[in-house]
A protein has these predicted regions:
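Short, glycine/charge-rich flexible loops or terminal/linker lids adjacent to PRPP-binding catalytic cores
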Residues: 11-56, 66-70
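PRPP-dependent phosphoribosyltransferase catalytic core
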Residues: 73-124
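A short, small-residue-rich loop immediately preceding and capping a beta-strand
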Residues: 2-4, 53-60
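Conserved long hydrophobic alpha-helices within structured protein cores
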Residues: 6-12, 79
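Short glycine-rich phosphate-binding loop at a beta-alpha junction
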Residues: 1-7, 86
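Acidic, glycine-rich active-site loops and adjacent beta-strand->loop/helix elements
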Residues: 7, 32-36, 89-92
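General beta-strand structural signal in soluble alpha/beta enzymes
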Residues: 1-2, 30, 114-117
Length: 124
């Protein structure tokens, strides 16, 4: 799993921790918004898997999908396969009559499946 810092950091860490407790280690990667200005100057931090590995991107709240797509692009550029984004809450901005929001449209255009645990209207 991977996520764009800072919002996804606790999600990535939580998935990694729970998977380790269940003896099914899932490594977590953090994708930076900008590369560090010192040290490795890397976009992606964490135990890097082999190129070609499938990675799911995690998001806390998704609105337009822009942050998630930025993370996906960096991961794909690094040689990983990303087909899915999982969000805790989908705000469903600019929702159409079919219940699809702006983020869902952006995900489809980037060949991504968007899965969310909650839609904002379910929480209000």
């Amino acid at each position: 799993v991977a996520g764009l810092t800072l919002g996804a950091d606790p999600l990535v860490a939580g998935v990694s921790l729970v998977s380790a407790l269940d003896s099914r280690m899932v490594n977590g990667l953090i994708v930076r918004k900008e590369p560090k200005g010192h040290g490795t100057q890397a976009w992606i931090e964490g135990p890097l898997p082999e190129k070609g590995t499938k990675i799911t991107v995690l998001e806390d709240v998704i609105t337009t999908g822009g942050s998630a797509i930025k993370a996906v692009e960096k991961l794909r550029d690094a040689g990983y396969i990303v087909n899915r984004v999982v969000a805790i809450v989908d705000r469903q901005d600019d929702c159409d009559s079919c219940g699809k929001g702006e983020a869902d449209t952006a995900m489809r255009e980037s060949d991504l499946e968007l899965c969310s645990i909650f839609k904002l209207n379910e929480l209000t």
